[in-house]
From Swiss-Prot:
Family: Belongs to the bacterial ribosomal protein bL35 family.
Organism: Wolbachia sp. subsp. Brugia malayi (strain TRS)
GO cellular component annotations of the record: cytosolic large ribosomal subunit
Biological process terms in GO annotation: translation
Protein name: Large ribosomal subunit protein bL35
Gene that this sequence comes from: rpmI
């Protein structure tokens, strides 16, 4: 029986060719007025998840994305 991939994980994460997990930077939904411009600028783009977080995400995408 094939395992299903979690749809929410498909939308939020990507895998690199080497198997690292990439996601968008967190903390940019609201409340940007309080933050410095450099902080907002640094939160653009994507980030590579750490080892423990990537292990959890990979459980939900058994065959990759």
């Amino acid at each position: 029986m094939k395992l299903k991939t979690k749809s929410s994980v498909k939308k939020r994460f990507n895998l690199t060719a080497k198997g690292k997990v990439i996601s968008a930077q967190s903390g940019k939904r609201h409340g940007m007025v309080k933050r410095s411009k450099s902080n907002i600028r640094n939160q653009r783009g994507t980030t590579v998840l750490g080892k423990s977080d990537s292990r959890i995400v990979k459980l939900y995408i058994p065959y990759g994305i």
